[in-house]
Amino acid sequence: MIVYHGSVQGVEKPDILHSYRPLDFGKGFYVTTVKEQAERWAKRKADIYEKDTGIVSIYEMKEDMQEFAVKIFKEDLDEWIDFVCDCRDGRPVYEQYDVIFGKVANDKVFRVVDMYHSGIWDKERAINEIKIYKTYDQIAFITQRAIDCLLKMESFYEV
């Protein structure tokens, strides 16, 4: 399966050491199956780092993950929101997995997490506020072993 990573440089040898902050699924190396989404990520990072262009790295991802601890979030947001909130709060709930698959929340997720954790909103309200990009996905590689065994860089291009 082909997956993509958006950044400001080609990432030939991904590693978890460069994951400096907890995202939806914790600290890890994030890819997507959606080319346009990776291009958007690359352009956003280029803007943040004041670069002229972003770079999308393309990888072949092995689909046989039987020897790895894999978490897949389907359409049910109930478990997903608690997991994302825990990860965004810096809790290491993600560390029990090697690879995590799921949807991508919109940019309001930080506000929703704050409202939910402060008790201002209950879970139902928080779930209703988080809008999921139906066609976007994210795959987080949590362990270096998973990256080394499952991802192989094919190429990269500028956006």
What is the predicted function of each stretch?
Residues L23-D24, R40, R44-V159:
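Conserved NAD+-utilizing ADP-ribose enzyme module
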